[in-house]
Amino acid sequence: MDLIRKIEAQNKKNEAFVFNVGDTVKVVYKIIEGNNERLQSFEGIIISFQNKGIGKTFLVRKISSGIGVEKIFPVYSPIIEKVEVLRRGKVRRAKLYYMRNRIGKAAMKIKERLNFKRS
């Protein structure tokens, strides 16, 4: 078990991610198409985390043309350039899967935490 922890410690990024479930984030990540490499962003609400050590992931949901789109991002992936927190959400659940059943404006409506200072 110590060997696994050593390898995980080496592969973790030094910067701390300071976002939680319910936050509205903009994830900028690299896409490689043949020889070209470009940056693409995905903006939405974090609806869950899966905590598995170095394999920690978070699920971001957005509404695009009236259709819900979800994308899973590994926290320690080298393809993620940055994660920018746009709004802090005030939620009382660890998993916001109930957001999948909402339609219209209610699908993206979460109360905002008031003591949020944008960096």
Swiss-Prot record:
GO terms for cellular component: cytosolic large ribosomal subunit. GO terms for biological process: translation. PROSITE patterns: RIBOSOMAL_L19. Gene3D superfamilies: 2.30.30.790. InterPro entries: Ribosomal_bL19, Ribosomal_bL19_CS, Ribosomal_bL19_sf, Translation_prot_SH3-like_sf. Coiled coil: none annotated. Keywords: Ribonucleoprotein, Ribosomal protein. The keyword Ribosomal protein applies. It comes from the Bacteria. One of its GO terms (molecular function) is structural constituent of ribosome. HAMAP family: Ribosomal_bL19. NCBIfam families: rplS_bact. This protein is located at the 30S-50S ribosomal subunit interface and may play a role in the structure and function of the aminoacyl-tRNA binding site. Belongs to the bacterial ribosomal protein bL19 family. This is Large ribosomal subunit protein bL19. It comes from Borreliella afzelii (strain PKo) (Borrelia afzelii). The gene is rplS.
